[in-house]
Amino acid sequence: MPDRPVRTRIAPSPTGMMHIGTARTALFNWLYARHTGGKFLLRIEDTDRERSTDEAVKVIFDGLKWLGLDADEPPVFQFARADRHREAAETLLARGGAYRDYMTPEELEAEREVARAEGRVVRSPWRDASPNDAPDRPFVVRLKAPQEGETVIQDAVKGEVRFQNKQLDDLILLRTDGTPTYNLAVVVDDHDMGVTHVIRGDDHLNNAARQTLIYQGLGWEVPVWAHLPLIHGPDGAKLSKRHGAQAVSEFDSMGYLPETMRNYLAKLGWGHGDDEIFSDEQAIAWFDINDVVSAPARLDWAKLNHLNNHYIRQAEPARLAELVKTVLASRDWPLEAGDMAVIERTIPFVRDGAKTTLELADNVVFALKRRPLELPEKTRTQMTEELRGRLSRLREALAAVEYWDVPSLEAALRAFAEAEGVGLGKFGPQLRAVLSGGAPAPDLAGAMVALTRDESLGRLDDALSPSA
């Protein structure tokens, strides 16, 4: 382990979406930096100029901000450092760790055919040629990888991983136009940013061997490698569109809270005993990259929904009201003055069963409906004179309730049912429909407290009017 303060990084490419796997990688880097008192850094690998638009970069910034993963230093943009990457390639050339390869495309294809037939990697005849023999034609710069022995990776997650050097080709460092390739740029940037721990998906494990050789060729300290298991779908297959959401923005729009995602993503490959729910502070105190398991993690929607319900029940109603407002706006639901107060007042009564803020929005709609409410057809057919009389007497009993709170209203409903000599089932469903207009609603007492005395009695009056 490097004898210096921990510096981790997340280095996404701006592709237009922030994948949930990238989010998990960012979280693990952030947690380990916070756990060790180190720094968490951000680099944008924007060398693909066609895809690296300002909008695509903003998606990354927005995703990290939503997740609450704050970088400790300004972001580094890889494309702007191309000169530094070329400088490192020149250093490797000067040290004999790289060479200029003048093979034409036709020669390269012929060598590939021979290498394939012989079961070996491609080797350029220019690997050991004298620079004095160089022709006047385009060239690439290749790493001069060792051809014998092994390159050994000590990985914090995978353990010791060995690569046979004879199976490692002389990877290209600079293309014919002088632009750097991924593996060179990553090594140079990580070194210059002082990155001590490279924590990333295990689809990069093979790159670790190649990058180790570049580090060694430049005489730089190799960082600690930690390659995280991939995230699979519930069926054990690699996560794909058929499993549902993949992007951070999709989980946001589906009504999941960022604290839910931090808690849930932390459990994908890491855990602390039997603890399923833990705060950011607990995760930071407990997290160690050496405790991450190497087996793929499976996305479990039931667990995610359970967690989200927990955090919805813990969140401040005012914050949830703003989230519900956003959901309703996306549905073109018109909000009027005073509606935010109604939403905030209603949330404590309807959130216990809500798995997402979308469901929470569904559950508050009853309180936002404008009078007079349209009763469900079933309720209208049930409004006999007998039921109207009973609801009218109930209205008077409710109007006499001194304290408009859940215990008082529950007591009033029980007393009324007893006085009428019937069970609550004889009028409760119809009262619920009168109060909610058929929309999802909480228990009767909770619904009436959310609506307030005046609104509840007003909705009863509307239902009992001759024109109803």
Swiss-Prot record:
Gene Ontology terms, MF aspect: ATP binding; glutamate-tRNA ligase activity; tRNA binding; zinc ion binding
Gene3D superfamilies recorded: 1.10.10.350, HUPs
Superkingdom assignment: Bacteria
Cellular component aspect of the GO annotation: cytosol
Keyword line: Aminoacyl-tRNA synthetase, ATP-binding, Cytoplasm, Ligase, Nucleotide-binding, Protein biosynthesis
Location of this chain's protein in the cell: Cytoplasm
Catalysed reaction equations from the record: tRNA(Glu) + L-glutamate + ATP = L-glutamyl-tRNA(Glu) + AMP + diphosphate
Keyword Transcription annotated: no
Main localization, broad class: cytoplasm
Any one Gene Ontology BP term: glutamyl-tRNA aminoacylation
Record carries keyword Manganese: no
CDD domains: GluRS_core
Its EC number(s): 6.1.1.17
InterPro entries, A to Z: aa-tRNA-synth_I_cd-bd (IPR045462), aa-tRNA-synth_I_codon-bd_sub2 (IPR020751), aa-tRNA-synth_I_CS (IPR001412), aa_tRNA-synth_I_cd-bd_sf (IPR008925), Glu-tRNA-ligase_bac/mito (IPR004527), Glu/Gln-tRNA-synth (IPR000924), Glu/Gln-tRNA-synth_Ib_cat-dom (IPR020058), GluQ/Sye (IPR049940)
A Pfam match: Anticodon_2
Positions that bind ATP: K241
Family listed: Belongs to the class-I aminoacyl-tRNA synthetase family. Glutamate--tRNA ligase type 1 subfamily.
PANTHER family: GLUTAMATE--TRNA LIGASE (PTHR43311), GLUTAMATE--TRNA LIGASE, MITOCHONDRIAL-RELATED (PTHR43311:SF2)
Subunit structure: Monomer.
Function: Catalyzes the attachment of glutamate to tRNA(Glu) in a two-step reaction: glutamate is first activated by ATP to form Glu-AMP and then transferred to the acceptor end of tRNA(Glu).
This protein's name: Glutamate--tRNA ligase
Native source species: Phenylobacterium zucineum (strain HLK1)
